[in-house]
Amino acid sequence: HVLRRRQRQMCIRDRPHPDHLSTARDLAATAVAAIRDHPERYAVYREQSYTYNDITQYNRNHLLREDPSVDGLKTGYTRVAGYGLVASAKRQGMRLVSVVMGSSSTASRKAETRSLLNYGFRFFETLRPLTPEASLTEARVWKGQSKQVALGVTDEVVLTLPRSTASIDTQVEVDEPLVAPLNLNDVVGRVTLLRDGEIVSEVPLRV
């Protein structure tokens, strides 16, 4: 029940086919949540071995011993799904999560994961175009003690996009007129982020 509720919170809902137990997107979302919400527990996934009752078990994620940037996450195998690996790596402050499913062997899943991570780090970058500390605009307030209010975002906006020399453009739309009373974090518009004229993200504009 707890797991089902947590999955709903992470928007893990319908399955694409009645015979599928999960999807790569579901596994990636679960991995991201584990890394973000439970850092103290996530550290266990980088352990290469564990000894209990005089029995040593070795981590089957062999990339932990071959790539210092890899610090997790979970291997798996079923007859139907084949060999799989959900991995995560961090290089120069950028973290990526990869999901490989349906491999024919442990060697294959390791090679595919390494290739996928290398591709991601080579051709993608993580940008932080908006921070909560920055005021994006000011707007007129009607029927209030203050005539102007500063507007921005409440959470840092983090985007992982294909590498490009193009900058991120910001468009701010305010749902005017703004009439008092206004409360902190009230949504009063939207912020649209664009690269080369294409929308890459939209977030609420807040007081």
What are these regions (language model features)?
Residues 18-207:
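Domain-terminus/edge residues, biased toward the C-terminal soluble/receptor-binding domains
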